[in-house]
From Swiss-Prot:
Domain Fibronectin type-III: 6-103, 109-207, 211-308
Keyword vocabulary terms for this entry: Repeat
Annotated protein name in UniProt: Oncosphere antigen A
Source organism: Hydatigena taeniaeformis (Feline tapeworm)
Miscellaneous remark of the record: ONCA and ONCB are the primary targets of protective antibody responses.
Superkingdom of this protein's organism: Eukaryota
One Pfam family this sequence matches: fn3
Length: 318
């Protein structure tokens, strides 16, 4: 008799490369009124979540990837007409499975690079030119997901760029909140979208967590100043990035880009020259090679090279 509480004729089919639709009929026997259903589903054999739906007969799984396998089952929630405080949960149906198809290609899968700069508080996205477009290229759409469960949420459209635009700057991002961004192209006149570009996943750090520490400058002779610093692990960025993929030093109006070191020597200076500099760190994620995170600049430090006479006098005293 317990099988009578199972939803009937449970089926699932792929509607397009990014959508699957599950349908069912009510159970053969209802213990009062059916007040809803719970769908348990997975993608590629990894259970993700349970979805509660109203007393409808269909549910759409959206924002899937092409060639992604969905496995789902469903159970009904019953409420006896004579006892509003009692709920009867029926038996789960046999799982059904479907795999989304490959898209009929309208252009090559797009790609982009993204850089977040703490000092500017913005994500700078540079989208590469579209390739192999079927028809006329109609522009790119930027999409984003945010939140602790951003992987489970639908992509939200941020902006539609014109066919000529390749750059977009995203502002107002919140520290310590997980984000994912991607793009897709549209072909005209069909208005069909391309596949989504490989997303970039990241979190915004607080400045004090990523800025270089213990920055110091010391003159070693009349023509040389050494600058040192520490790049402590970043509790936010380090989840995604290797510490200090590179550093940048600002000296007056000049910028120097260095490899992953913790010392730089300014040479060829004149005696009694004051030098001021600050430094930031460039983080490169391990899982998102097209993303770069630039920390805030450190406080400015200053050092002055001694005169030749000062050095000669000091050596004479020794």
């Amino acid at each position: 008799e317990f099988r009578a509480s199972i939803p009937q004729n449970v089926q699932i089919e792929a509607i397009d490369p990014h959508t699957a639709r599950m349908t069912w009929d009510p159970p053969a026997k209802s213990y009062g009124s059916i007040i809803g259903y719970t769908i348990q589903w997975s993608t590629d054999d990894l259970w993700l979540e349970q979805v509660k739906v109203a007393s409808d007969n269909s549910y759409d799984f959206k924002d899937l990837q092409s060639q992604q396998t969905i496995v789902a089952s469903i159970l009904a929630h019953h409420r006896p007409d004579t006892s509003v405080k009692f709920e009867y949960i029926g038996t789960r149906s046999t799982p059904v499975k479907v795999t989304t198809p490959l898209p009929s290609r309208v252009m090559k899968k797009p790609s982009f690079r993204a850089t977040y700069c703490e000092d500017l508080e913005e994500l700078d996205m540079l989208i590469h030119d579209p390739e192999e477009v079927v028809g006329m290229f109609g522009g790119f759409e930027v999409l984003m997901r945010a939140g602790d469960a951003e992987l489970l949420k639908s992509w939200q459209s941020v902006v539609n760029l014109t066919a000529e635009e390749r750059r977009y700057k995203l502002k107002g991002l919140v520290p310590s909140l997980p984000y994912a961004v991607t793009v897709r192209g549209v072909a005209l006149p069909s208005r069909r979208f391309s596949e989504l570009a490989e997303p970039v996943h990241f979190k915004i750090s607080r400045a004090e967590q990523s800025v270089p520490q213990n920055v110091d400058m010391q003159a070693t002779d009349p023509h040389t100043i050494e600058m040192t610093w520490d790049c402590r692990p970043n509790p936010t960025v380090a989840l995604l990035a290797t510490p200090s993929a590179g550093v940048a030093i600002t000296r007056s109006s000049r910028s120097l880009h260095l490899a992953s070191v913790q010392l730089y020597t300014f040479t060829g200076l004149e005696p009694q020259v004051s030098l001021s500099a600050s430094i930031c760190v460039h983080y490169k994620p391990q899982k998102s090679p097209n993303f770069e995170y630039i920390s805030s600049f450190s406080e400015v430090v200053t050092a002055t090279t001694p005169s030749v006479e000062q050095v000669d006098f000091a050596e004479g005293e020794e």
